[in-house]
Amino acid sequence: MTRRVQYRHFLWPRPRLDAIDWLMSDASYRDAIFSTPLDRVANFSFDEKVVACFPDMIRRSVPGYGQILGMLGLIAERHLRFGAHVYDLGCSLGAVTLALAGRLPPDAFTLTGVDLSPTMVARARETLGEECPDHRIDIVEGDIRHVDYRPAGMIVLNFTLQFLPPEDRRAVIERLYAALEPGGVLVLSEKIVLPDEQENAWLVERYHDFKRANGYSDMEISQKRTALENVLVPDTLDAHHERLHEAGFTRVSTWFQYLNFASMVAFKDA
């Protein structure tokens, strides 16, 4: 029988739950990467410049990111088998892992975070080592398409799949389904596109309004969009749901959407 625990009765040294606010501790790390005119806009990459301002970039560019983080901890608290393994794929600076560690005690789970950026990995190791010294967390550099996955109770893809070539996404989801234990949960957060061109254009404009309200100029918005054009290729929600069902998931729900950003949860039958 699966052992589930009401973790709120445990006391342990917790990291700050609002991981983004904690990571963004120095105003000098404001995202200004695209604030000057560029003769040539290179493809977006998670290099040292991006890592330095990443928390601010995420907070001002991804609607609802903080709410998603908070719910990930609650989803894990509700559905994760005690002692199970967790994967944080595309872990960046470790915000998802911090959110889980803020809800679950050190003996409740083990976790592997994977990221392709060596700079992200180094920073995440430093952050999590300081904030979660008692949790069993391993951050590794690697490509999620080629990880040798061990059985896991929960897998999180938080705005990660969208950066893979579209033709590789189905195989990744199939491998993650195979790695999940019966009753395991996959959380998939993605930027999305609407199938109706007019509706999608309206949503994109409101997203640009969101960024303007958060201090980005029209030039920054335009140059960032150009940088991401061939790097981040979004899918429709229907395409995501179809892919998840075809991989074997029978329960798939979109539990969160803010403008053209959404998060889905998929369960493997027990």
UniProtKB/Swiss-Prot annotation:
CDD domains membership: AdoMet_MTases (cd02440)
Single GO biological process annotation from the record: tRNA wobble uridine modification
One Pfam family cited in the UniProt record for this chain: Methyltransf_25
Record's subunit section: Homodimer.
Keywords in alphabetical order: S-adenosyl-L-methionine, Transferase
Functional description taken from the UniProt entry: Catalyzes the conversion of S-adenosyl-L-methionine (SAM) to carboxy-S-adenosyl-L-methionine (Cx-SAM).
Catalytic activity: prephenate + S-adenosyl-L-methionine = carboxy-S-adenosyl-L-methionine + 3-phenylpyruvate + H2O
EC number: 2.1.3.-
Family: Belongs to the class I-like SAM-binding methyltransferase superfamily. Cx-SAM synthase family.
Residues involved in S-adenosyl-L-methionine binding: Y65, G90, C91, S92, D143, I144, N158, R225
Protein name, as recorded: Carboxy-S-adenosyl-L-methionine synthase
GO molecular function, one term: S-adenosyl-L-methionine binding
Highest taxon of source: Bacteria
Organism: Chromohalobacter salexigens (strain ATCC BAA-138 / DSM 3043 / CIP 106854 / NCIMB 13768 / 1H11)
InterPro entries: CmoA, Methyltransf_25, SAM-dependent_MTases_sf
